[in-house]
Amino acid sequence: MTTYATDSQGKFIPSTQRPDGTWRKPRRVRDGYVPQEEVPLYESKGKLFAQKPLLPPGMSPEMAQKSREKREREQRIKQQREADANRRPPQNPVPGLLILNGDSKINQPQQRAAKSAKPKKKAVELPDVLLEQKQKEEQKQVRQQQQQQKSQKDHKNTKPHHQERIEEVAKAMNGLQLTNNHVASASAADALQTDLSKKLRKLRKKIREIEIIEERLRSTDGGPRPDKDQIDKAKRKPEILKEIEELEKGIAK
């Protein structure tokens, strides 16, 4: 355990001598610092519970042993009384008549009468119940057959009407499909005309740019000369004029 000394500035660890004879410097201790070896070890709840005494405070092991033996003895006596009560012979049906535990001949007629009485009651009630269930099932089957026959007749009567409705719907769908095809073809033609017009405008714009380049080539006022890309663009003038002519024919159609 670390020993501390105290001065006017607080606690500190005094200097100690090493095994080689040299001395360590004294070290100042911060307030509230606890060395690692003095930190209490963590113990789980199970370990703490196991360390607690099993007996109540002030109770000796001998007293606990006597109390446990007394409780076990009382429990055995209680079980013995219950077993004796279960083995107790039945009450005498006739006053003055003694019935022993091993003699069961006297009780046999009564037991046979009780056993035979119960099945007779069931034999009387069971057929009636089965008969009622069978009648209910037959009535249910008859009702189901009648409902099936009625539904089949209704289906036969309504079949022509449904057929007419189906044919009307099919005709309407065919007419709608033709209308949609016509609208689609018209919209496609309009889109094609729009694309041709846009392309024609772009080509005409290129022709105007080429004409400007040609004017710069013909001019002698000493202005800036066209570069190589502009000259190559001017050489494509015949091709562009041919494309414009073809597009104009396509738009005219």
Swiss-Prot record:
The keyword Cytoplasm applies. GO terms for cellular component: cytoplasm; exon-exon junction complex. Residues 1-19 have a biased composition (Polar residues). GO terms for biological process: exon-exon junction complex disassembly; nuclear-transcribed mRNA catabolic process, nonsense-mediated decay. Keywords: Coiled coil, Cytoplasm, Nucleus. Signal peptide: none annotated. Residues 129-156, 189-221 form a coiled coil. Residues 65-87, 131-141, 151-168 have a biased composition (Basic and acidic residues). Interacts (via N-terminus) with mago and tsu/Y14; the interaction is direct. Regulator of the exon junction complex (EJC), a multiprotein complex that associates immediately upstream of the exon-exon junction on mRNAs and serves as a positional landmarks for the intron exon structure of genes and directs post-transcriptional processes in the cytoplasm such as mRNA export, nonsense-mediated mRNA decay (NMD) or translation. This is Partner of Y14 and mago. It comes from Aedes aegypti.
